[in-house]
């Protein structure tokens, strides 16, 4: 079942004759994980802001969980979508972690007692309940993003959108965030849309949408994207380390029966090849 669908979507920023989003058509299935990639200025962040109604399309249609986005349905649709942005510090407004998670529910007229229960449950879900009374400023980057994710989960959305949510973190922090999202998707059957410029972080995605100058240049599986060197080059994208390594090994004479998207799988394959087992 489609939970998101766009039809002939167009958008231009005020006083600009150039369309930031042009004739965009795509759909997302319930429970699917889609990653939107593209170089800077390709329209990635503009597109997700259109999906949530933060920006109003010039023309076209957006359908979220059976509702066509309009002024009348805007708040109902926003209840279905949670967005985590790039910089978690910009999302904190309270003195303690649990107050901050509860704050986001005030706009939804949720009773005070229920807000506290939801906030505690969301913090447990992301593994941050032990930090409930701490100040957000004392947390690491990865911990801050987990709290930001908890704030979104407390609203109980069906769709989770991550706008470069791990790009400012160190490798450990990024892994912390992606593993949290993976667990949540599996437990709650969330639909996930992540915006990313780093192809190294696509392995959890079911599908990839590549934007170029506001248009969809490709809507494909990960391995199909990685195998199209011309498409990657045109869009200033580089193969992730793991895929580049496999490409180099093929050229050196090692035959692969499949493409490996995880380091451990590749290491196991190479070990068996070398040992002859």
Swiss-Prot record:
Q: How does it sit in the membrane?
A: Peripheral membrane protein
CDD domains per record? ABC_cobalt_CbiO_domain1
In terms of InterPro entries, this protein maps to: AAA+_ATPase, ABC_transporter-like_ATP-bd, ABC_transporter-like_CS, ABC_transpr_CbiO/EcfA_su, ECF_ABC_transporter_ATP-bd, EcfA_1, P-loop_NTPase
Q: Which PROSITE patterns match?
A: ABC_TRANSPORTER_1, ABC_TRANSPORTER_2, CBIO
- TM ranges are none
Tell me the Pfam families matching this sequence: ABC_tran
Positions binding ATP in this chain are: 38-45
Could you name the domain of life of the organism this protein comes from? Bacteria
Q: Which UniProt keywords apply?
A: ATP-binding, Cell membrane, Membrane, Nucleotide-binding, Translocase, Transport
Q: What cellular-component terms does GO give this entry?
A: ATP-binding cassette (ABC) transporter complex
Assembly, in brief, is: Forms a stable energy-coupling factor (ECF) transporter complex composed of 2 membrane-embedded substrate-binding proteins (S component), 2 ATP-binding proteins (A component) and 2 transmembrane proteins (T component).
Q: What does the UniProt record say this protein does? A: ATP-binding (A) component of a common energy-coupling factor (ECF) ABC-transporter complex. Unlike classic ABC transporters this ECF transporter provides the energy necessary to transport a number of different substrates.
- The protein's name is Energy-coupling factor transporter ATP-binding protein EcfA1
Species of the source = Oenococcus oeni (strain ATCC BAA-331 / PSU-1)
Organismal lineage: Bacteria, Bacillati, Bacillota, Bacilli, Lactobacillales
């Amino acid at each position: 079942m489609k939970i998101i669908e766009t039809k002939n979507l167009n958008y231009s920023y005020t006083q600009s004759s150039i369309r930031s989003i042009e004739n965009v058509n795509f759909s997302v299935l319930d429970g699917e994980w889609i990653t939107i990639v593209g170089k800077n200025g390709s329209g990635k962040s503009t597109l997700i802001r259109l999906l949530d109604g933060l920006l109003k399309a010039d023309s076209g249609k957006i359908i979220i969980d059976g509702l066509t986005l309009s002024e009348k349905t805007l708040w109902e649709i926003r209840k279905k979508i949670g967005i985590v942005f790039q910089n978690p510090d910009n999302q904190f407004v309270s003195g303690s972690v649990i107050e901050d998670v509860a704050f986001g529910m005030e706009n939804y007229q949720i009773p005070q007692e229920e807000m506290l229960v939801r906030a505690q449950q969301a913090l447990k879900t992301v593994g941050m309940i032990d930090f409930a009374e701490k100040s957000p400023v004392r947390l690491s980057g990865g911990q801050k993003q987990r709290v930001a994710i908890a704030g979104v989960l407390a609203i109980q959305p069906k769709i989770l959108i991550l706008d470069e949510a791990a790009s400012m973190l160190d490798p450990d922090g990024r892994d912390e965030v992606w593993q949290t999202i993976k667990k949540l998707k599996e437990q709650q059957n969330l639909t996930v849309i992540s915006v990313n410029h780093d192809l190294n972080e696509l392995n959890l995605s079911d599908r990839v949408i590549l934007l170029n100058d506001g248009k969809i240049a490709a809507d494909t599986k990960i391995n199909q994207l990685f195998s199209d060197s011309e498409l990657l080059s045109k869009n200033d994208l580089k193969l992730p380390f793991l895929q580049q390594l496999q490409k180099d090994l093929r050229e050196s004479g090692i035959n692969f029966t499949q493409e490996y998207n995880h380091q451990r799988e590749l290491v196991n394959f190479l070990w068996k090849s070398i040992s002859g087992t």
